[in-house]
From Swiss-Prot:
GO terms for cellular component: cytosol. This is Nucleotide-binding protein BceJ2315_27070. It holds the Pfam family DUF520. Belongs to the YajQ family.
Length: 161
């Protein structure tokens, strides 16, 4: 029985490369000369450092640009609040989201059942497994999910015949 998994996961290698490119650009840009602006990464948590709110916005723009160039969807980023860390310096913690949340998984299952396509959906941890008898049904399910779920980036992997 053909099946595939619906997941939501960023490519962390590309995220790391985008951070390195961002730090390189920040270190060479004229408007950041003499400032302590940078991006650090610990697992799935990115920390943006800057001298003030304006420069923090500039750091964020550079990071988003580099992520977009490396084909990492910026909807994976979850921004925390801006914190002051002494003097005028500020930092912001950005979390890279992973996995299909419970609410989104239920929404996907409901969409699949309401679509009247002859496939079954089951929640398996942080993924949703879609299985059906025909490959065409699975492909039309992928097209339907891409059209209807726009708030979270979805990946379709583990396609098996």
């Amino acid at each position: 029985m053909p099946s595939f998994d619906v997941v939501s996961e960023a490519n962390m290698i590309e995220v790391k490369n985008a951070i390195e490119q961002s730090n390189k650009e920040i270190s060479t840009r004229f408007d950041f000369k003499g400032s302590d602006a940078r991006v650090e990464q610990k697992e799935r948590e990115l920390t943006l450092f800057a001298d003030d709110d304006f420069k923090l916005g500039q750091v964020k723009d550079v990071l988003i640009g580099k992520l977009a160039k490396r084909n990492v969807d910026v909807r994976f980023l979850d921004y925390g609040k801006v914190e002051k860390i002494g003097g005028d310096k500020v930092k912001q913690i950005v979390t890279v989201k992973k996995g299909v949340t419970g609410d989104l998984a239920k929404k996907i299952v409901r969409l699949v059942k309401d679509s009247k396509i002859k496939v079954q959906a089951s929640i398996q941890g942080d993924a949703v497994r879609i299985s059906g008898t025909k490959r065409d049904d699975l492909q039309s399910t992928i097209a339907m999910l891409r059209k209807d779920v726009t708030d979270t980036p979805l990946d379709f992997n583990n396609f098996r015949d």
